Amino acid sequence: FGSSRRSATKVFGPPLPSARAVQLRTPRAAMNRLQRIAGHVVATGADAPLRMAPTSSAMSAAEKSDDDVVICCAVRTAIAKANRGAFKDTPCEELLAPLFKAVKERTKLDPAAVGDIQIGNVSQPGAGAVTSRMAQFMGDLPFEIPLSTVNRQCSSGLQAVANIASSIRSGVIDVGIAGGVESMSMYNMASSVDPSKFSTKIADSDLAMACLIPMGITSENVAEAYKIPAEKQNSMAVASHNKAIAAQKQGLFDEEIVAVKASVK
């Protein structure tokens, strides 16, 4: 959701037409969920600092209910490199609009049933509300559907998903669309921060000043704090890329990726 050069959307809704997500989980169900989440994390050793258990093993025994909030459709664009990749000259609205169209076509959903749309983003001007709203219309979704955007840095798309799911569970809406979009070619992190516009009083707070630390330095600090050397980071990166290549060859991404025509200048 909302990676540097891609866009992704998810559609949520009740599994049954008449179901509404208004019933809160029982203490037992909540405890089961905590146990599943805890079981998803595997104790790490010196040779595997970030080893995780398969998601399937954590959710296979999940209790099902008619008021469960479920993902009905999940799509995304392909991933490209910032500043020199296939999407470097493609605006965010042109990345997001095809996904709205794909969601509408694949689900055969009546747009009137959609109660809300929320899109996560970080660097777009105007909190990304304008570009996401334009993408909504370019994606053939009517103006009657409200849209909002959210910025929680790298978790922006995930926060949008959580917010829409929460709205369904609380009974505010029955169906919603959530996702994220970002282009670090069009809007890089530095361009969205102008230190001259901040109060001079931020210098009085170490934490306030720390908000200006770039993510690159933050990652170095985290690696040092948790004693994760570059060799282990590189090893994990290689393993991740190998898994991605294997998944591509097996066609595991074919269904979720929506083709987007792009012009490179």
Residue ranges and their predicted role:
Residues 3, 14, 52-56:
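Compositionally biased, low-complexity segments
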Residues 20-21, 29:
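Intrinsically disordered, low-complexity proline-rich regions
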Residues 172-174, 253:
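Short, high-confidence coil segments that cap the C-terminus of an alpha-helix
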Residues 12-17, 24-25:
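N-terminal, intrinsically disordered, basic low-complexity segments enriched in Arg/Pro/Ser/Thr
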Residues 1-5, 9:
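Low-complexity, disordered terminal segments
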Residues 123-130, 134-137, 141-143, 150-172:
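Claisen-condensing/thiolase-fold acyl-transfer catalytic domains that form or cleave C-C bonds
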Residues 27, 32-145, 181-265:
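Conserved "HGTGT" condensation-loop signature of ketosynthase/thiolase-family condensing enzymes
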